[in-house]
Amino acid sequence: MHCSSPKMVCETKIVADEHDAIHGTKKESILWSSPPSSAPLNPAEAKDVRKDVVFIREFERGDQEEVRRIFYEGIMERIPNTAFRGLWQQPKTQFLYALLTIMCFYMTKSVMLTCCAPLILMGARYYYSRKVIQNYLDCALHTDMADIDAYYMKPTGSCFWVAVLDGRVVGIVAAQGHEDENTVELRRMSVDSRYRGKGIAKALGRRVLEYAMRNNYAGVVLGTTAVKLAAHKLYESLGFRRTGQSEDYRLPGMSRSPLERLFFQIRHTRYRLQLREE
């Protein structure tokens, strides 16, 4: 039987312009022997803490608004990334769009319309990316992100943490236990865009791995639709290994209409970090 870990605060020192402040590289495959938990700081001690120190603590009800803001902004960033940058991951779609552009020329014999065709296609991609991702966001904000306490803090094997810098919540991450597979799923990781590049995401990821180790799970899994290479490098630096990939992933809220399939594609990648042999 797994049990939730006691409330604790993990202190991580973050230096302002240091891009890898948290120790751990690709060479460090498994290094998740957890340090002893430290007691929460009292107000007198908190005054002496430097402003470049990040604290990762468990979610509290008063964090709800900031947590939802960080999650919302992080998901909304994926609209242009999916619409435009994501196209480079879809060679078949590139070929199809090129074919449609050529067909436009042969059917209209208009150079102007042919030159406008790629712009129309990109506009349609942005429209459908926004539509699908907003539907997904609406679904999330009305399920687990609507009541974090009920979804993550109360169930056994799950937890939610926030990263706090200078009294402000700047990052979030969740762990959801799957008893049937003896794994923990890393979910909802996001860092405020103003505080990225300081090692906060890596510290949040390590917190989930420590939690899994303390509760005797065999592994940690995650699935991501992130387009940016930096996100995938982060997971690999934590020790995760890619286990699968889908080019035809269906997000919650998708209708799968012909136009949506034509103008919205997203790659879903699965990762796993094996903590111990079962």
Predicted ranges, named:
Residues 188-193, 197-214, 233-237:
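Conserved acetyl-CoA-binding loop-helix of GNAT-fold acetyltransferases
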Residues 212-224:
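Conserved GNAT acetyl-CoA-binding A-motif
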Residues 1-53:
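Cytosolic, low-complexity regulatory segments enriched in Ser/Pro/Gly with interspersed Lys/Arg
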Residues 68-71, 75:
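Hydrophobic alpha-helical core bundles mediating ligand binding, dimerization, or RNAP-core interactions
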Residues 59, 189-191, 224:
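Hydrophobic adenine-recognition pocket in adenosine-nucleotide-binding enzymes
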Residues 55-66, 93-94:
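A short beta-loop-alpha structural element at the N-terminal edge
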Residues 9-10, 41, 128, 138-144, ...:
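Conserved catalytic-core motifs of GNAT/GCN5-like acyltransferases
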Residues 12, 75-80, 85-98, 102-187, ...:
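Acetyl-CoA-dependent GNAT
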